């Protein structure tokens, strides 16, 4: 960030010192470009002695201080670089402020970044850091506003949708988080990751089967061997009594693949019960209990008790 910028504030030096400074300034840059960082260090320090008001040299000094774990010196140099040339040297200074775990410094960083953003409307890196700063301080609504700015630069895409989803989830606004996922799926319906996110959000927010079924169907189209989704689809079909034969077919596949899974056995047993096959229902529900171990799911016990009562 600004490692190879032009020298600043040399007009206050004598002609002789200007020439001397420029020679060593560009030599330091050459060495840094060649990744001879340690070799460049004494030259940078000499440049600082010649001209302590050069933004680039202060930035270098700050970065060297960071490698030496001298936090106070690093903060001073990087702050000075920012003061001398805010548009060029905002990045390292604000990274340090945001990492400080000092809320006053973090708020200061936000204020400065906001002011910079007012005069640099197309700086993606600047807006990205401002958004991170808002997230650090849990100002998620402000972070969402910044996302609008980022979208005006990059356009709306998967990364934007993901960030909007996360920020709304942080705000515990599950309804809007779902809308963000659904919005992107209208553009890219074959995006498996987003289909999974939608399904998980639906499950977390206990959406009705009418919403869950299409979500499971979409994933199965892309991942037809996903038996967990297969089981959940079968269960939701069973809940609303829709296409019980298909529910039975899907559920049968799950218990064939995992014959000791109590959840899958329970689903199959309950579908058998809904189909009126009492003997099979009790057989599979009992197996679900047997394979549950010490902790038996209450729902499995409820299903077994209800089936036992009605299938006498």
Question: Can you say where each PLM-predicted feature lies in the sequence?
Answer:
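TPR-adjacent "capping" and linker segments in tetratricopeptide-repeat scaffold/adaptor proteins
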Residues: 9-23
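Short coil turns that delineate tetratricopeptide repeat
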Residues: 18, 52, 86, 121, ...
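Start-of-helix register in tetratricopeptide repeats
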Residues: 22, 56, 89-90, 125, ...
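Canonical tetratricopeptide repeat
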Residues: 26, 60, 94-95, 129, ...
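Residue-level recognition of tetratricopeptide repeat
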Residues: 29, 63, 97-98, 132, ...
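Register position in tetratricopeptide repeats
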Residues: 33-34, 67-68, 100-102, 136, ...
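Single-residue signature of alpha-solenoid repeat helices
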Residues: 40, 74, 109, 143, ...
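Alpha-helical adaptor scaffolds
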Residues: 97, 199-205, 217, 227-257, ...
């Amino acid at each position: 960030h600004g490692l190879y910028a032009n020298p600043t504030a040399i007009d206050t030096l004598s002609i002789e010192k200007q020439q001397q400074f420029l020679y060593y300034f560009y030599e330091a840059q050459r060495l840094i470009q060649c990744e001879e960082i340690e070799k460049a260090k004494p030259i940078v320090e000499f440049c600082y002695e010649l001209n302590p008001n050069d933004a680039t040299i202060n930035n270098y000094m700050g970065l060297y201080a960071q490698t030496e774990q001298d936090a106070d010196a690093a903060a001073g140099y990087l702050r000075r670089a920012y003061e001398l040339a805010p548009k060029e040297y905002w990045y390292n200074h604000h990274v340090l402020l945001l990492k400080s775990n000092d809320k006053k410094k973090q708020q200061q960083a936000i204020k400065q970044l906001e002011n910079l953003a007012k005069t640099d409307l197309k700086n993606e890196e600047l807006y990205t850091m401002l958004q991170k700063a808002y997230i650090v301080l849990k100002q998620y609504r402000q972070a969402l506003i910044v996302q609008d700015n980022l979208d005006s630069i990059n356009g709306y895409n998967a990364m934007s949708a993901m960030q909007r989803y996360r920020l709304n989830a942080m705000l515990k606004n599950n309804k809007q988080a779902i809308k963000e996922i659904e919005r992107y799926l209208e553009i890219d319906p074959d995006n498996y990751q987003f289909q999974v996110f939608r399904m998980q959000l639906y499950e977390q927010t206990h959406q009705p089967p009418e919403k869950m079924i299409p979500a499971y169907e979409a994933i199965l189209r892309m991942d037809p061997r996903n038996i967990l989704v297969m089981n959940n689809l079968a269960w939701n079909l069973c809940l609303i009594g829709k296409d019980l034969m298909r529910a039975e077919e899907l559920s049968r596949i799950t218990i064939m693949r995992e014959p000791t899974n109590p959840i899958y056995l329970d689903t199959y047993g309950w579908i058998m019960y809904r189909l009126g096959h009492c003997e099979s229902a009790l057989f599979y529900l009992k197996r679900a209990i047997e394979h549950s171990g010490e902790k038996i799911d209450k729902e499995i016990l409820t299903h077994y008790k209800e089936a036992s009562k009605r299938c006498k």
